[in-house]
Amino acid sequence: MAKRIKDPGEKSRIRATIFDKLNRRGKWGPIHTSKENALKGIPSHDIGIAKDILEEAIKEGFLVPKHTGYGDHVSLNFKKNGEIMAIIASLLAG
């Protein structure tokens, strides 16, 4: 079970960090990476909530799931490019 977030901006920061990492690595559409790699670099005390945020992003359509023989992978959704870039820009602005 993930910890409860006291600061609502913390959830946005973690989401933007995940999206920024995938964007910088070019993980759009058919180019995917494992869920574990998407979460690398997140502080260990935030991993639980980051996993929940990753699952929420899949349900909301920001991330596209890809089931492979060696685990579940994700990539950024081209159709939500504008929204994803706005979320990343909010991270860089703050």
Label each residue range with its predicted role:
Residues 1-24:
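Short alpha-helical segments that sit at the start of domains
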Residues 7, 11, 31, 46:
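Residue-level marker of regulatory loop/turn positions in helix-turn-helix DNA-binding domains and
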Residues 28-42:
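Short acidic, hydrophobic short linear motifs in intrinsically disordered regions
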Residues 43-59:
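Short amphipathic alpha-helical interaction segments
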Residues 52-54, 65, 74:
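Charged interaction/catalytic cores of defense and host-pathogen modules
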Residues 58-68:
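A short, conserved structural fragment
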Residues 70-76:
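Minor-groove-contacting beta-hairpin "wing" of winged helix-turn-helix DNA-binding domains
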Residues 79-94:
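Short, amphipathic alpha-helical interaction segments positioned at domain boundaries
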